[in-house]
């Protein structure tokens, strides 16, 4: 799943899509997920600032929304969630000379807001599961 924050993807739309597959008895596997930080212009690669807080937050929000649509909104339907790499220093997206910074860690292996968004979502979900009394 290769997406960009400038695409009009919402958690609700993704949740409905995943539910539709589940309603047909299918499992959903989100695989090869990467979310480009930089936008493309007319199909060409562009350069952007990998430290731009607005871009980083949009990327983090989309990572979080995809995971939430998968595991929180469709428990039992979504059975896999995998990224296409770990850090921005080694990504297939940079093969054409552009830079896209699509992963959870930057080029220095520092956590990006996307990592924190996924971690916080999973942690809050785990805490709810552990604290349930039923």
What are these regions (language model features)?
Residues 1-8:
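Surface-exposed cleft-lining segments at the edges of enzyme active sites
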Residues 9-29, 33-134:
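Aromatic-rich peripheral "rim/lid" segments of glycoside hydrolase catalytic domains that contact
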């Amino acid at each position: 799943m290769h997406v960009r924050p400038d695409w009009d993807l919402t958690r609700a739309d993704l949740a409905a899509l995943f539910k539709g597959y589940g309603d047909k008895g299918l499992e959903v596997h989100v695989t090869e997920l990467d979310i480009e930080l930089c936008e493309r212009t007319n199909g060409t690669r562009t350069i952007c600032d990998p430290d731009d807080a607005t871009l980083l937050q949009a990327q983090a929000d989309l990572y979080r929304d995809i995971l939430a649509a998968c595991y929180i909104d469709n428990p039992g339907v979504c059975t896999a969630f995998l990224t296409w790499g770990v850090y921005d220093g080694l990504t297939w997206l940079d093969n054409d000379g552009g830079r896209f910074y699509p992963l959870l860690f930057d080029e220095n292996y520092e956590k990006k807001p996307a990592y924190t968004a996924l971690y916080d979502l999973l942690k809050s979900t785990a805490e709810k599961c552990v604290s349930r009394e039923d």
